[in-house]
Amino acid sequence: MKESINILAIESSCDETSAAVVVNGREVLSNIIASQISTHEKFGGVVPEVASRKHIEVISAVVQEALDEANFTLDDIDAIGVTYGPGLVGALLVGLQYAKGLAFATGKPLIGVNHIEGHISANFIEYKDLKPPFMCLVVSGGHTFIVYMKDYGEFEVLGETRDDAAGEAFDKVARAIGLGYPGGPKIDKISKEGNEDAIKFPRANFHNDTLDFSFSGIKSAVLNYLNKKEMKGEEINKADVAASFQKSVVDVLVDNTIKACMSKKVDKIAVAGGVASNSCLRETLVRECKKKGIEVLIPPFILCTDNAAMIGSAAYFEYIKGRRTSLDINAVPNLKLGER
């Protein structure tokens, strides 16, 4: 095998169009991201059809910019990695069809990547010496998992949400208290002005034999609290509501993740996904894990949100295992972690 494997990666699962050039799964030569946040902000959330159209408009330019920044041409690329699920089916298809076209035209192998595996692999970029096994908390707008990573590309899901994802709950609560979209960063910001102990919102407690999450109850409790306040004509302290809600979500995430580490006797937690940027989650996880002698690894913001560099990293580890993807692959919006 060549000393350096160069992956051109494409990501378009939701509302970011991204392309990157990644060498050997850990060195990022370029990571171009065209965000659609300002486009969807006026709608209060991502509109799938609008997202797809925006991807179509920019994907060619984004891929070319990624190659140019890396000072590469397609001749320098060994394989093309692309997200094929989970995500919005229309958005996924834009990136997938573009990648398939490149693979067909150049004869380069195609490697389909699970978006969640990409989030986990972002840690290999930031932490060059990181190797499995380790625990990973994946928290994003559409997904919440506790994953035991046994080896590269080998996962055991120990816990997952039974209803709303953590990021989805953040967005819905932010909308309810008038903060708008995107909800996660706005709740994080206003919470710094509030009292996290002002309101006691419930935590979902399942039996001890599961590490699953449930955030719909917390979300409903917030909505009920707001409705009661409005019916009584009482003033609502948005900062207190946001801080109390945030604490209830973070407490559950941290508690279950530490329990997972104890069950597998691992001393390393990696965090992945957009909600990993939340300052309360970062601070609480680091503080509580320190008490247990557990190391916490959290990538920088640019690698927490959707990006193609993480897809390039995951694609590399698939590539060296000899895995290749047929050009007749289709988008799988509900793709499960570990499915091939």
From Swiss-Prot:
It comes from the Bacteria. It is an enzyme of class 2 (transferase). Gene3D superfamilies: 3.30.420.40. GO terms for cellular component: cytoplasm. Pfam families: TsaD (PF00814). Keywords: Acyltransferase, Cytoplasm, Iron, Metal-binding, Transferase, tRNA processing. PANTHER family: TRNA N6-ADENOSINE THREONYLCARBAMOYLTRANSFERASE, TRNA N6-ADENOSINE THREONYLCARBAMOYLTRANSFERASE, MITOCHONDRIAL. Belongs to the KAE1 / TsaD family. This is tRNA N6-adenosine threonylcarbamoyltransferase. It comes from Clostridium botulinum (strain Okra / Type B1). The gene is tsaD.
